[in-house]
Amino acid sequence: MRRLLLSLATALLASLAASAGAAACYADYKAKQDNPLRLHYGVAEVRGDCTRAAARDDLARRLAAQGWTLLNVVSVFDETGLEKRKDSAGPNFLRF
């Protein structure tokens, strides 16, 4: 019985840790298009690890598919940072 309770407790802790690690991740970034030069600031959900390097790789690929070049990732953040960036991102808020 004790072994069963210990196994259940371990499984519960592992599932809690996994769900905490699966929290949404977002990045704000700057991108450009050439001919004519167009610049934009945007906010996008990041797939994968919540790091600037992972965001850079993910966003560069997604933006390039639409003819944009990623200039830089400004920051990565969780959902608590979305609202304060929404107006600045305008039509590029969660577009890519």
Question: Positions of the model-derived regions?
Answer:
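Terminus-proximal functional modules
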Residues: 2-96
